[in-house]
A protein has these predicted regions:
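Short histidine-centered beta-strand/loop micro-motifs
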Residues: 86-90, 108-115, 156-157, 230-236, ...
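Short acidic-glycine-tyrosine-enriched beta hairpin
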Residues: 134-149, 256-271
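Positively charged n-region of N-terminal signal peptides that target proteins for export
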Residues: 1-4
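Bacterial Sec-dependent signal peptides at the C-terminal "C-region" and cleavage site
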Residues: 8-29
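Short, conserved beta-strand element in jelly-roll/cupin
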Residues: 102, 114-130, 221-225, 235-252
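Ligand-binding loop in jelly-roll beta-barrel domains
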Residues: 149-174, 271-298
Length: 300
């Protein structure tokens, strides 16, 4: 009798597997993501699943160094292979650097200029001043600065708190003609676009002078309202998309894994159409990200 019960129980488990999706054998390639209950991807497959932990990194994991005339810089994402990262955070293909840059209280940088590099800097903590090519501008949280190649600049922090920025660097190619003056932008003056991927509330930057990037790249501040979830979705070859948390600590659905994402932490979506990403504001606190979309896949 006991044996019959065990056999019946085993058959019931097999039937349940048939209803919910067969447990597949060992796979040789990562399955496509799907919401279907009988999809192969409704099980995890560690042998072939993308190791998404390599694609998310916090600046705290990097050692500080001096750069760009006196900033204290710490890498978040670095050049590498977005399909097979050689180490954590080494996922950049098109841009040169993605990092945190900070000025200590009551300090400033020395004059700095590069003829081959352009910088986008977004303030996420503190306030200060930038001088570039004869222009001056106050900067604070909510603002961004674009510094073209060939323009000398300095930053100043007259306050008693750190000035912290997200710095994105790109190299220009031969024949590229950069702008001749800096651009200053502010997302707080922009009417929001609501509802992309269910829950994103996006604001681009309103610039005094439109920046001229060498890459097909754009930036925006994106929020998610209290207790809401963004649609998990994937990206393919040629898409270099990065999300950096600026405010709040969110939940991140990343492939078939779940992460906390903290301020100063950024992730790049693997461009293989295998890894859905979707952020969740599970709290009653504000959530804000810096979005970067470098869309080489949209070039004709």
């Amino acid at each position: 009798m006991k044996r019959i019960v065990l056999i019946v129980a085993g058959l019931a488990l097999v039937a349940l597997a048939l209803v919910l999706g067969q447990v597949p054998g060992k796979l040789t390639e990562e399955p496509d993501p799907s919401f279907a209950e009988d999809a192969v991807s409704n099980h995890r497959h560690p042998d072939v699943d993308t190791d998404v932990g390599l694609y998310i990194n916090h600046w705290r994991n990097s050692l500080p160094y001096e750069g760009h005339g006196g900033f204290i810089e710490r890498d978040i994402l670095t050049p590498g292979d977005p399909l097979r990262p050689p180490k954590k955070g080494a996922v950049l293909k098109y841009i040169k650097a993605y990092k945190r840059a900070a000025l200590e209280p009551l300090t400033g940088t020395q004059a700095f200029k590069s003829d081959k590099e352009q910088l986008f800097l977004c303030v996420f903590s503190g306030e200060g001043r930038v001088e570039a090519g004869g222009q001056k501008a106050a900067v604070e949280k909510g603002m961004a600065v674009f510094l073209p190649a060939g323009v000398s600049f300095r930053f100043f922090n007259p306050a008693n708190a750190y000035l912290e920025l997200i710095m994105v660097a790109e190299e220009i190619s031969a024949g590229f003609v950069p702008n001749t003056k800096m651009s200053v932008g502010d997302y707080r003056e922009v009417v929001p676009s609501v509802g992309m991927h269910w829950a994103h509330i996006g604001r681009g930057f309103k610039w005094d002078t439109p920046p001229k990037f060498a890459n097909p790249v754009g930036f925006a501040a994106v929020s998610i309202d209290k207790f809401d979830i963004a649609q998990p979705h994937v990206h393919g070859p040629g898409c270099e998309e990065i999300w950096c948390q600026l405010e709040g600590t969110s939940l991140l659905i990343f492939g078939n894994r779940l992460f906390y994402q903290e301020p100063g932490e950024a992730f790049l979506i693997p461009p293989n159409r295998k890894v859905p990403h979707g952020s969740v504001n599970h709290t009653d606190e504000p959530m804000l990200w810096l979005y970067m979309g470098n869309r080489h896949d949209h070039l004709k």
